[in-house]
């Protein structure tokens, strides 16, 4: 018989609805919904009232690491539903003015270093991207999706074969505004 011991307890606000179906944890607040799979053989989730308990059957460094990671991810899900995450990026160029626009689920970067073909970056999940002057604002309930979208935009403006200390054109993350 496996003995499960309680490793961590996360308090959930009363207005956030929590559901656990197998290993899939879903949270709903208003019209926002987040789902994440938490699967492991030695660490499990239990939902009781307005608490999520993380229990483990082994006590070694791997399981302690998983417990801490899961606790952080669950608290980020709650924070994302209640407040959201906002990142700010700056459009930086020296000679050729970049035109940045949002078309559907992609960010289109035109006239980067005078290139004729536009560069594109994918918008991940429910992330909202808006362009105001030389700033890009990324908002969304999932920290992972907002961060991945910011990385996609920054990666789309990498210049291969040039010294980045000299050629500093690009779109860079300046604030995580958490």
Swiss-Prot record:
The gene is rpl6. Gene3D superfamilies: Ribosomal protein L6, alpha-beta domain (3.90.930.12). GO terms for biological process: cytoplasmic translation. Part of the 50S ribosomal subunit. It comes from Thermoplasma volcanium (strain ATCC 51530 / DSM 4299 / JCM 9571 / NBRC 15438 / GSS1). The keyword RNA-binding applies. The keyword Ribosomal protein applies. Keywords: Ribonucleoprotein, Ribosomal protein, RNA-binding, rRNA-binding. The lineage of its organism: Archaea, Methanobacteriati, Thermoplasmatota, Thermoplasmata, Thermoplasmatales. It comes from the Archaea. Belongs to the universal ribosomal protein uL6 family. This is Large ribosomal subunit protein uL6. GO terms for molecular function: rRNA binding; structural constituent of ribosome. This protein binds to the 23S rRNA, and is important in its secondary structure. It is located near the subunit interface in the base of the L7/L12 stalk, and near the tRNA binding site of the peptidyltransferase center. It holds the Pfam family Ribosomal_L6. One of its GO terms (cellular component) is cytosolic large ribosomal subunit.
């Amino acid at each position: 018989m496996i003995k499960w011991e309680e490793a961590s307890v996360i308090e959930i606000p009363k207005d956030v609805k929590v559901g656990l179906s197998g290993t899939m944890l879903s949270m709903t607040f208003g019209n926002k919904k987040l789902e994440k799979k938490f699967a492991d053989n030695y660490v499990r989730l239990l939902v009781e009232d307005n608490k999520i308990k993380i229990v483990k059957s082994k006590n070694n460094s791997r399981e302690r690491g998983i417990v801490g990671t899961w606790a952080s991810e669950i608290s980020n899900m709650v924070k994302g539903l209640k407040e959201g995450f906002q990142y700010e990026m700056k459009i930086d160029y020296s000679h050729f003015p970049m035109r940045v626009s949002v078309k559907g689920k992609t960010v289109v970067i035109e006239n980067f270093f005078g290139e004729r073909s536009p560069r594109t970056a994918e918008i991940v999940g429910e992330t909202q991207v808006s362009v105001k002057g030389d700033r890009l604002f990324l908002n969304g309930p999932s920290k992972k999706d907002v961060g991945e979208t910011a990385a996609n935009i920054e990666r789309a403006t990498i210049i291969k074969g040039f010294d980045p200390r000299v050629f500093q054109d690009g779109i860079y993350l300046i604030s995580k505004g958490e």
